[in-house]
Amino acid sequence: MAVYTHISETDLKTFLASYDIGNALVLKGIAEGVENSNFFLQTERGFFILTLYEKRVEEKDLPFFLGLMEHLSRRGLNCPQPVHNRSGHALGRLAGRPAVIVTFLEGVGADVADARRCAAVGEALARLHQAGADFAGKRTNALGLAAWRPLFETVRDRADTVAPALAATIAEELDFLEAHWPRALPQGVIHADLFPDNVLFRGETLSGLIDFYFACVDAYAYDIAICLNAWCFEPDLTFNIGKGLAFFTGYEHVRKLTAEEAAALPVLARGGALRFALTRLVDWLNVPKGAMVNPKDPLEYMGKLAFHQTVGTVRELGLLR
């Protein structure tokens, strides 16, 4: 989450007039994250999150995201619910941007990713995969393998200002991934961005999943790889195999991985690391002037990629097959 677009009091009042949630009492920008403009909204009738969609989110995809959240909620997954206005629409416009109000979930992001929480996240991800299996909406992964080289080309000539030889390292990894990317794996709806700040806890209990704006239809194992990268590394970029074991235990408590998925995970983890290194690199080099956003360090994910380049089998990630 972040703030790129600022909202005037007059515009907010006009926007809220079409809803049955009362007048605004508090509107506070949320600096965390990098994709959309997000605000904590308190009205006379409760607490909400107001999102203005920017950058990589295309307006045509919003019905998929909003419909998915409603579908997952009906299947028992605790996630934000779009608030509909009096005309029955969840999607509106505010400050020249597509805008949505969603319900506020109690809980805080996981500042500490210990093994217990990794297990809870693994189980929650598997339940998400199961719950989304019969969702009728379709959306291809706009940041999948096919998007990485074009994305890289937008910053290739500046990459080495971030780290020496970074452009060559990325180009070499792209060549490898394009030659070895796993195909024909089980797929369905994936979250694709289930980082610790998108998982809420109340104490040690997982209370909800948020930020579904990269959700798409892709390989379930790729979603797992993203989570391993987000949850199972230590601050010094060493991989904690105990956390990996806990994550897989939680996931397979709900859904067993196929042999093909397990074998593919080392390559998928490399791809997941490069995907986030690339988008972070683009963001790092293109922070809009005046934006309330804290860009993430792309070199963190290059370090994770370097680890995965040494991995031979999924056992080294914690799946004991």
Curated annotation (Swiss-Prot):
SUPFAM superfamilies: Protein kinase-like (PK-like) (SSF56112). The gene is thrB. It comes from the Bacteria. InterPro entries: Aminoglycoside_PTrfase, Homoserine_kinase_II, Kinase-like_dom_sf, Pseudomonas-type_ThrB. Keywords: Amino-acid biosynthesis, ATP-binding, Kinase, Nucleotide-binding, Threonine biosynthesis, Transferase. Its EC number is 2.7.1.39. This is Homoserine kinase. Signal peptide: none annotated. HAMAP family: Homoser_kinase_2. Pathway: Amino-acid biosynthesis; L-threonine biosynthesis; L-threonine from L-aspartate: step 4/5. GO terms for molecular function: ATP binding; homoserine kinase activity. One of its GO terms (biological process) is threonine biosynthetic process. Disulfide bonds: none annotated. Belongs to the pseudomonas-type ThrB family. It catalyses: L-homoserine + ATP = O-phospho-L-homoserine + ADP + H(+). CDD domains: HomoserineK_II. NCBIfam families: PRK05231.1, thrB_alt. It is an enzyme of class 2 (transferase).
